[in-house]
Amino acid sequence: MMINAKKLMKLAKKWQQRAALKRKRISFQRSSITTSSQTAVEKGCFVVYTADKIRFSFPLSYLSNTIVQELLKISEEEFGLPTEGPITLPFDSAFLEYLINLIQRRMDEDTEKALLLSISSARSSFQPQQHCSATQQLLVF
């Protein structure tokens, strides 16, 4: 499943506008990915929270990654588009850190496809009380 550049830019702009409604100040980007409890969003970044309430800040360039697109789609299906709160992913912080590591290693196309299939299968078997077992079934690279 690929998303064309025009639709991706439209999606990114929609998320930026929603995020802009909530932020009060913008600071300059110091690192590519951070986890913290601060409320301001660095310029050129977007923020997501995990199911265990950990905050992650990503550069906007990550929006073009198919894995990140799939995570945002899962979030939208699970929680809807946030109007009064942050974007929340239905995964814990350890799983998201694992995905970030794989994205930063610039995996090949076959590995990316396998990971997307794993995320989809984990999502289809996702139950709130089975959350840990669903994420443990993912492929490890």
UniProtKB/Swiss-Prot annotation:
Location, primary (coarse class): membrane
Subcellular location: Cell membrane
Disulfide bonds: none
Gene Ontology CC terms, in alphabetical order: nucleus; plasma membrane; pollen tube
Keyword Flavoprotein in record: no
A Pfam family matched in the record: Auxin_inducible
InterPro entries: SAUR_fam
Tissue-level expression: Expressed in stamen filaments and petals.
Lineage: superkingdom: Eukaryota
Keyword field: Auxin signaling pathway, Cell membrane, Developmental protein, Growth regulation, Membrane
GO biological process: auxin polar transport; auxin-activated signaling pathway; ribosome assembly; stamen filament development
Membrane topology annotation: Peripheral membrane protein
Miscellaneous comment as given in the Swiss-Prot or TrEMBL entry: Plants over-expressing SAUR62 display twisted inflorescence stems, and increased length of stamen filaments and petals.
Function: May promote auxin-stimulated organ elongation, such as hypocotyls, stamen filaments and petals.
Family: Belongs to the ARG7 family.
Full protein name: Auxin-responsive protein SAUR62
UniProt organism field: Arabidopsis thaliana (Mouse-ear cress)
Gene behind this protein: SAUR62
